[in-house]
């Protein structure tokens, strides 16, 4: 990527040796205006740092902030621990902070983070659910126009096989975007946590898990979420049925 701006930015990736954080680390390391910093405690941290020629490596944000306050920090961590890290960045004086979806387990905590960032003048961003699927916004506009008739039912065909909050918020966000409706009631069941998707620091009440059931939407339509089946992973994120057909 080429830019007329010659300024360089110090960008720290917290969890940059993780399953998803590695993509952020690669992006920062390969950008001509970024000096990447890796904050991670995993066994493969040093291997990732060597691969990307990252020389500034720390185990914790506390260690990093004792040396410097970067321009940007990306907190790519499980939702159970991410909010505290985001707020630590804000308090340290970082001016640009991002985290992975969702922002927090509880809406009130997410609101607090957004408001704190706004009050402190911090640019804050979270995830990519609205634009990772091509033509999502355009499809939502077509549905809203009435060209396909009225929406009669909605489903998340693949269910929520590993997480409701972490991996599941993408489907839920895209369902809300396509239908233009909000969830008014929930009826369902949770399943045991999937080991690799649970943060070691998480309490039982914080641990994310698979689930299935029904969601009552503000437009009167019900969204069906079937029980996930290991032997049949369905790639379709959201299915919308209208009086004229199905998308």
Give the role of each language-model region:
Residues 155-235, 239:
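Rossmann-like dinucleotide-binding domain that binds NAD(P)(H)
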Residues 14-15, 39, 76, 127, ...:
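Short hydrophobic segments within beta-strands
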Residues 1-52:
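N-terminal Rossmann-like dinucleotide-binding module
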Residues 25-26, 46, 62, 172-176:
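Active-site phosphate/pyrophosphate- and oxyanion-stabilizing loops and adjacent acidic/basic residues
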Residues 65, 72, 103-172:
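A contiguous active-site-proximal alpha/beta segment in oxidoreductase catalytic domains
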Residues 52-116:
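Beta-loop-alpha module in the N-terminal Rossmann-like domain of NAD(P)-dependent dehydrogenases
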Residues 7-9, 95, 122, 152:
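Nucleotide donor/acceptor-binding cores
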Residues 239-247:
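C-terminal glycine/acidic-rich active-site capping loop/insertion
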């Amino acid at each position: 990527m080429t830019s007329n701006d010659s300024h360089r930015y110090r960008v720290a990736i917290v969890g940059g040796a993780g399953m998803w954080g590695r993509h952020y680390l690669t992006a920062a390391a390969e950008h001509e205006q970024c000096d990447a910093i890796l904050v991670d405690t995993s066994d493969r941290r040093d291997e990732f740092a060597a691969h990307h020629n990252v020389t500034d490596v720390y185990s914790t944000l506390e260690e990093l902030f004792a040396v410097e306050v970067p321009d940007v920090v990306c907190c790519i961590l499980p939702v159970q621990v991410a909010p505290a890290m985001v707020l630590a960045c804000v308090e340290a004086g970082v001016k640009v902070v991002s985290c992975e979806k969702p922002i927090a387990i509880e809406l009130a905590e997410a609101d607090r983070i957004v408001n704190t960032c706004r009050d402190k003048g911090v640019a804050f961003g979270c995830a990519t659910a609205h634009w990772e699927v091509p033509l999502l916004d355009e499809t939502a506009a077509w549905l809203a126009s009435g060209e396909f008739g009225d929406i009669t039912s909605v489903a998340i065909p693949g269910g929520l096989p590993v997480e409701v909050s972490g991996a599941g918020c993408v489907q839920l966000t895209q369902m809300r975007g396509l239908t233009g409706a909000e969830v008014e009631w929930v009826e369902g069941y949770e399943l045991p946590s999937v080991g690799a998707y649970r943060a070691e620091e998480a309490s039982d009440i914080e641990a994310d898990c698979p689930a299935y059931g029904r969601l009552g939407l503000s437009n009167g339509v019900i969204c069906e979420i079937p029980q996930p089946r290991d032997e049949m992973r369905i790639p379709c994120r959201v299915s919308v049925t209208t009086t004229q057909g199905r998308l």
